Amino acid sequence: MPSRTADAVVIGAGVIGASIAYHLTHLGIRPLVVEEHDPAAGSSGACDGLVFLQSKKPGLHLKLALESRARFDSLREILGTGIEFRPTGGMCLVETEAELAAVRRFVVEQRATGLDVELLDGGEARRREPELSERVIAATYSPADAQVNPYGLTFAFLRAARAGGAQVLTGRPAVGIRVDRGRVEAVQLADGAVSTPVVINAAGARAAEVGRWVGLEIPITPRRGQILVTAAVPPLIRHCLISAQYVAAKFDPEIARRGMGFSVEQTDNGNLLIGSTREFVGFDRRTTLEGLRTIAARIAPVIPALKRVPVIRAFGGLRPYTPDGLPILGPVAGVEGFVMAAGHEGDGIALSAVTGELVADWVTTGRTQFPLGAFCLERFQAGAA
């Protein structure tokens, strides 16, 4: 490929990169998106579709999620019904007194942050979700929780981006970034260079590799999640569901080692997606019999009706994990024109809308409506507050 230029280059065509490309075109930027494989071939194509707010830490993380959720209603109109966005509401299921004590505090803090959420006793939880067993002693409920088709969302963002002037190259991996005097100059592909003043690292679980091309150490590591997919059945659950243990394990490694939470959603087609393991196994995305058995054994006592539903397949995906559970967003010190947009782990779908908007705003104006300081790469440096 001969040398060419682009207003900006987005590395990665998952849901984050696709959203960024779409939002850039709305601001007059015509980006080039480069993807080693196919769109949504990484985390975005191997995950559930939860736009779940109750799993977010009160404070900045939840505020970011609320901002993103607010944009999905309009995105449904703009991107079309193919994204399968459904505001089903969600429930976080409590099984122990220890979980209940933690959830009570969580609800107070989430309400203070702006989330519409309430605590239900076990009886009310079963009234709203009749298939829940007596094992569920309480639950929280939020009407803000929703679900979407991750593939549909990613491809809809890319279609809209192309319509706005973006180019998308698939099967064309970036292999390096050229920096001159501390400033991004070009992205190197296998068959040529693309001159550009801006490179956006939306490479998901492989974002650390991209960072090394410009001399950065980015603390993003892959964490595998395995998910079961059932046959299509008539409506079995009414909401998207997660366990309180899942929420706690997301932020507390000790709880994660003591057991596994779960998440359940039913798609438009009637299939149920049941997850998920959280495993540090490098870049191995294969499913394991042990992992799948663990998921099935974990969910069956909570929703006994699932014992009668056949599993038709399973998949594993790699989530881009950061040590503090927050994504890395925005510019980085020392490399002008290099912008981070990775590290969302299991929140990429939920945060995709606002991430794309914020990164596009920063690229075009150097400002954002939502402060990015808490999400900067420099927070991991020694001595950072």
Predicted feature descriptions by range:
Residues 2-16, 32:
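Beta1/beta-strand and adjacent pyrophosphate-binding region of the FAD-binding site
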Residues 140-197:
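Helical element adjacent to the flavin cofactor pocket in flavoenzyme catalytic cores
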Residues 63, 93-102, 141-159, 169, ...:
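Short beta-strand to alpha-helix junction loop
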Residues 48-128, 261, 290, 298-299:
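Dinucleotide-binding Rossmann-like beta1-alpha1 core, especially the glycine-rich loop
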Residues 22-26, 49-52, 81-86, 176, ...:
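Active-site substrate-recognition segment that forms the wall
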Residues 25-45:
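Glycine-rich FAD pyrophosphate-binding loop
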Residues 150, 284-385:
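C-terminal catalytic lobe of FAD-dependent flavoproteins
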